[in-house]
Amino acid sequence: MSIVMQLQDVAESTRLGPLSGEVRAGEILHLVGPNGAGKSTLLARMAGMTSGKGSIQFAGQPLEAWSATKLALHRAYLSQQQTPPFAMPVWHYLTLHQHDKTRTELLNDVAGALALDDKLGRSTNQLSGGEWQRVRLAAVVLQITPQANPAGQLLLLDEPMNSLDVAQQSALDKILSALCQQGLAIVMSSHDLNHTLRHAHRAWLLKGGKMLASGRREEVLTPPNLAQAYGMNFRRLDIEGHRMLILTI
């Protein structure tokens, strides 16, 4: 798989790094670790929203060399929960994120997959927290999906599962898997280690802004690594053919 993004000695004051790594096309990479590990800081840096020490190459070019307009065509970024910036119909908000605004069928498909069919005419400031999160997710998917944006390469998601129920999380997993199969690179933060063990291809385990481990999910999410990150003891079990992590007392 080709390298989409290369990080070299990336650091930000006392909050992050230095750390290095690479993001590959057609894979889902999870950032895991305790609160304050630096996951959100790292995602914002990878999105080009902040600057600091070290270097990031995106599609073979320095990240800082990308204009905001061009960057928005090649990568999409979902930050942590935000309130709607202003009131407008959901369909209008989603349309603003589409590069090809004639693809109304795609908008309807993505909205339907995230159970937003009956919310398209509602104002963004009249949504619940979970509804707004799904609208935001639909927006970044529409922005970057190769179906309508052949230039799309990278999707960055900061705790995308927040405020989603089990069915909605499953729906999002299906969408992300489909995007991955179309060649998109996906990087997302997660607090659900078992979800990472099931759905990520690779993982970066962070603590205190440092990278404790990186590699295939099974190699990273080991009891010794997790004990070092969280200060708690874990066991990894096989239950009906699925691996699962549990805390031990």
Swiss-Prot record:
GO terms for molecular function: ABC-type vitamin B12 transporter activity; ATP binding; ATP hydrolysis activity. Its EC number is 7.6.2.8. It comes from the Bacteria. Keywords: ATP-binding, Cell inner membrane, Cell membrane, Membrane, Nucleotide-binding, Translocase, Transport. The keyword Cell inner membrane applies. It is found in: Cell inner membrane. Belongs to the ABC transporter superfamily. Vitamin B12 importer (TC 3.A.1.13.1) family. PANTHER family: METAL TRANSPORT SYSTEM ATP-BINDING PROTEIN TM_0124-RELATED, VITAMIN B12 IMPORT ATP-BINDING PROTEIN BTUD. This is Vitamin B12 import ATP-binding protein BtuD.
